[in-house]
Amino acid sequence: MAVVKCKPTSPGRRHVVKVVNPELHKGKPFAPLVEKNSKSGGRNNNGRITTRHIGGGHKQAYRIVDFKRNKDGIPAVVERLEYDPNRSANIALVLYKDGERRYILAPKGLKAGDQIQSGVDAAIKAGNTLPMRNIPVGSTVHNVEMKPGKGGQLARSAGTYVQIVARDGAYVTLRLRSGEMRKVEADCRATLGEVGNAEHMLRVLGKAGAARWRGVRPTVRGTAMNPVDHPHGGGEGRNFGKHPVTPWGVQTKGKKTRSNKRTDKFIVRRRSK
């Protein structure tokens, strides 16, 4: 994998930095594991904008990724690594010994021809999935379940991982990349190693159009708007003279947004600033 800085042949190419991985499959994805993925444009079923700055972008097909990794005791061979437009991580197409194929998140160091396995008897090596009660304390893992059998939810982005720092009875304590310490049931599964494609964070789009290709629309500052459009709008100068708020008047910049008190007891330490 190489990080390539483009030559300044035009203003739009001058600042582009891209990640090139010659190991990625150059053909089409495995058709039985692909389904249609319609864009919402940030609108809900009433047609109202629920998430700003979303719209347009290249059409994408959704790759069905196996986050549960519940095919126990059957070894699988990695056939190829693939690009996935729906996530920052790459994915791997694996062939199980019984003939079934599945997509999984590609961990760091995984390559075509490697063998992986799931279940309590799986070896402690990158790419294998086990319940966390069977994984040594201190190990780095990814694709971590929050409820047994639900499928991995934590640490799925490129280059991310979670560290198991303690095991106490029915729970294990995890240290997330944000600094948060959290308890999860020991029967929850996790995949050993960290997610691959860590160089994703080094890429530079280089121009606004590259963001539009990805379905990202412009973000306009509130101070650049009129008073009818935003609480920060209007005025002769650049100051808006009040505490920063969202377009709907809700305090921003530091205001707590977490409301799920039911699971507060599982958070040992809040994330570091």
Swiss-Prot record:
It holds the Pfam family Ribosomal_L2_C. Residues 28-53, 221-273 are annotated as: Disordered. GO terms for biological process: cytoplasmic translation. PROSITE patterns: RIBOSOMAL_L2 (PS00467). GO terms for cellular component: cytosol; large ribosomal subunit. The keyword rRNA-binding applies. GO terms for molecular function: rRNA binding; structural constituent of ribosome; transferase activity. Keywords: Ribonucleoprotein, Ribosomal protein, RNA-binding, rRNA-binding. HAMAP family: Ribosomal_uL2_B. Belongs to the universal ribosomal protein uL2 family. One of the primary rRNA binding proteins. Required for association of the 30S and 50S subunits to form the 70S ribosome, for tRNA binding and peptide bond formation. It has been suggested to have peptidyltransferase activity; this is somewhat controversial. Makes several contacts with the 16S rRNA in the 70S ribosome. Part of the 50S ribosomal subunit. Forms a bridge to the 30S subunit in the 70S ribosome. This is Large ribosomal subunit protein uL2. It comes from Salmonella arizonae (strain ATCC BAA-731 / CDC346-86 / RSK2980). The lineage of its organism: Bacteria, Pseudomonadati, Pseudomonadota, Gammaproteobacteria, Enterobacterales.
